Amino acid sequence: MFADISAQHWAFAIYVIGAIAICLTMIGLAALLGGRAQGRTKNKPFESGVDSVGTARLRFSAKFYLVAMFFVIFDVEALYLFAWSVSVRESGWVGFIEATIFIGLLLIGLVYLWRIGALEWSPRKPQLNNKNTD
């Protein structure tokens, strides 16, 4: 049964057994040698020597998520352009025209986002009408 197993399989099996043994040894030594503090503050969160104050839940503005989504969208599109730039000689003029149309669509999308105010970090200030209506 063990004669038909190749040397590579034996080496992998020894590696897996060794990795599991090292993990179990470290967990066992930590359990044996680790300190056992009992008291009120055992279950209290500890962060870099500073006692925690307040809640851990923070509210983030939706602008953070919008910026992250825009980054992902334009980053993926940059990857498409990188793939095109690698094969620019093989794609010829047809590929160049397609890439130009693609870049144009990206610019149209960017202008649209800019026009609707999605890229502005602070809210728009209301415009005051200074017309005298006497």
Swiss-Prot record:
One of its GO terms (cellular component) is plasma membrane. It catalyses: a quinone + NADH + 5 H(+)(in) = a quinol + NAD(+) + 4 H(+)(out). It is a multi-pass membrane protein. The chain crosses the membrane at residues 12-32, 64-84, 93-113. Pfam families: Oxidored_q4 (PF00507). Gene3D superfamilies: NADH:ubiquinone/plastoquinone oxidoreductase, chain 3. Its EC number is 7.1.1.-. The keyword NADP does not apply. It is found in: Cell inner membrane. GO terms for molecular function: NADH dehydrogenase (ubiquinone) activity; NADH:ubiquinone reductase (non-electrogenic) activity; quinone binding. The keyword DNA-binding does not apply. NDH-1 shuttles electrons from NADH, via FMN and iron-sulfur (Fe-S) centers, to quinones in the respiratory chain. The immediate electron acceptor for the enzyme in this species is believed to be ubiquinone. Couples the redox reaction to proton translocation (for every two electrons transferred, four hydrogen ions are translocated across the cytoplasmic membrane), and thus conserves the redox energy in a proton gradient. Belongs to the complex I subunit 3 family. This is NADH-quinone oxidoreductase subunit A.
